């Protein structure tokens, strides 16, 4: 789907979001690694300063986890670090097409993949519960490069061309991506498993709206 075809029905806010992500993608690929990481961390700090609702939610959640008041200095410092790390996540994800997969392989220590190997060797396929820990995009790209037939489900973002942007990138490194709400989604995932594939599902986020 082209950018022109995808603009139908977009609000101006959605258009700004789309081009913001496109600019971020370009920047991540163009900058040297060390410079990009530092710049995105600064961007994370800026987001903490201006995104009042997200900042308030982060402070409230971390205060509960740490057993401190939301205004506590430790809670605030931890929240700022979380925003920096989230910005780093986007840098690493968008930089993937510009990074050698062998350099990623050299930095990954794979633990527990023998369980996948046994399941696939037996022709059973499997479903893997994953969490938003580290960078799932990097791990998925690495696993696909290693030959694991990975499929996953992603939230159908708006505007549509933003979803397609992420879909093209992930499918570009070998991960099949199914959008939420797609007719026959469960059947397609089950078919992927029956074909001796691996379905990776984020188990720490509920997209149903029911908590």
Describe the residue ranges of each PLM region.
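Soluble catalytic domains of membrane acyltransferases
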Residues: 97-211
């Amino acid at each position: 789907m082209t950018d022109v075809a995808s603009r139908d029905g977009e609000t101006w806010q959605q258009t700004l979001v789309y081009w913001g992500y496109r600019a971020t993608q370009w920047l991540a690929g163009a900058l040297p690694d060390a410079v990009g990481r530092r710049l995105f961390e600064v961007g994370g700090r800026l987001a903490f300063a201006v995104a009042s609702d997200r900042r308030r939610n982060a402070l409230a959640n971390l205060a509960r986890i740490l057993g401190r008041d939301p205004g506590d200095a430790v809670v605030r410092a931890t929240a700022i670090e979380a925003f920096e790390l989230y910005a780093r996540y986007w840098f690493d994800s968008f930089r993937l097409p510009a990074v050698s997969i062998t350099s990623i392989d050299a930095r990954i220590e794979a633990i527990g993949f023998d369980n996948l190997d046994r399941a696939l060797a037996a022709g059973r396929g499997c479903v893997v519960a994953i969490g938003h820990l580290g960078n799932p995009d990097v791990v998925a790209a690495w696993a696909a490069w290693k030959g694991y037939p990975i499929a996953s489900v992603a939230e159908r973002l708006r505007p549509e061309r933003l979803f397609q942007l992420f879909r093209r990138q992930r499918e570009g490194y070998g991960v099949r991506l199914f959008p939420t709400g797609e007719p026959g989604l469960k059947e397609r995932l089950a078919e992927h498993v029956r074909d001796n594939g691996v379905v990776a599902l984020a188990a720490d986020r509920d997209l149903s709206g029911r908590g």
